Amino acid sequence: MAAESLPFSFGALSSWELEAWYEDLQEVLSSDENRGTCVSPPGNKEEESKSFTTLDPASLAWLTEEPGPPEVTHTSQSPCSPESSQSSLAQEEEEEDQGRTRKRKQSGQSPARAGKQRMKEKEQENERKVAQLAEENERLKQEIERLTREVEATRRALIDRMVNLHQA
């Protein structure tokens, strides 16, 4: 069984990105466990392990989406107030479901195929970038060689001039 690489490296995430991912994960876990009610994060290891074992795979569908900047979904109301938690979570879930069905209809592919297609497109884009950088590198090498020859010629001319001045 081969390990699949992550879409990002651990060193590339800033602290605010990690915090946003953590908050998103807590929201998903709390909405799945309590069917939309807001709870505080689990306090002990037993509760944490229970929350991970009771997850519905559909609640983790956000993991298959393309990584990008985290969306800000905070409102001015307190996050655990009954009015805001139930209505905003329901609205967010509805919007996410509509967005996913639109994406699937537009692409005409399953999420796994769309993910593979994105990976293939990214790989092709990376190959194009490598080719462009190789061309630029070669051009810069030629420019360095030209400038080196020019500096050597100028240096020789300067030395000749200084020698001729001392002889005269």
Curated annotation (Swiss-Prot):
Region span, Interaction with TRIB3: 10-18
Gene Ontology biological process terms from the UniProt entry: apoptotic process; blood vessel maturation; endoplasmic reticulum unfolded protein response; ER overload response; intrinsic apoptotic signaling pathway in response to endoplasmic reticulum stress; negative regulation of DNA-templated transcription; negative regulation of myoblast differentiation; negative regulation of transcription by RNA polymerase II
Residue segments, region Basic motif: 100-129
Comp. bias regions, Basic and acidic residues: 118-141
Region (Disordered): 31-141
Principal subcellular localisation of the protein: cytoplasm
GO cellular component entries: CHOP-ATF3 complex; CHOP-ATF4 complex; CHOP-C/EBP complex; cytoplasm; nucleus
Modification comment: Ubiquitinated, leading to its degradation by the proteasome.
UniProt GO MF annotations: cAMP response element binding protein binding; DNA binding; DNA-binding transcription activator activity, RNA polymerase II-specific; DNA-binding transcription factor activity; protein heterodimerization activity; RNA polymerase II cis-regulatory region sequence-specific DNA binding
Localization, UniProt: Cytoplasm; Nucleus
Residue ranges of domain bZIP in the record: 98-161
Sorted UniProt keywords: Activator, Apoptosis, Cell cycle, Cytoplasm, DNA-binding, Growth arrest, Nucleus, Phosphoprotein, Repressor, Stress response, Transcription, Transcription regulation, Ubl conjugation, Unfolded protein response, Wnt signaling pathway
Compositionally biased region (Low complexity): 76-90
Residues covered by region (Leucine-zipper): 133-147
Residues annotated with Phosphoserine modification: S14, S15, S30, S31, S78, S81
Region (N-terminal): 10-26
Domain notes: The N-terminal region is necessary for its proteasomal degradation, transcriptional activity and interaction with EP300/P300.
Protein function: Multifunctional transcription factor in ER stress response. Plays an essential role in the response to a wide variety of cell stresses and induces cell cycle arrest and apoptosis in response to ER stress. Plays a dual role both as an inhibitor of CCAAT/enhancer-binding protein (C/EBP) function and as an activator of other genes. Acts as a dominant-negative regulator of C/EBP-induced transcription: dimerizes with members of the C/EBP family, impairs their association with C/EBP binding sites in the promoter regions, and inhibits the expression of C/EBP regulated genes.
Assembly and binders: Heterodimer. Interacts with TCF7L2/TCF4, EP300/P300, HDAC1, HDAC5 and HDAC6. Interacts with TRIB3 which blocks its association with EP300/P300. Interacts with FOXO3, CEBPB and ATF4.
Family per similarity comment: Belongs to the bZIP family.
Designated name of the protein: DNA damage-inducible transcript 3 protein
Organism: Bos taurus
Lineage: Eukaryota, Metazoa, Chordata, Craniata, Vertebrata
Primary gene name: DDIT3
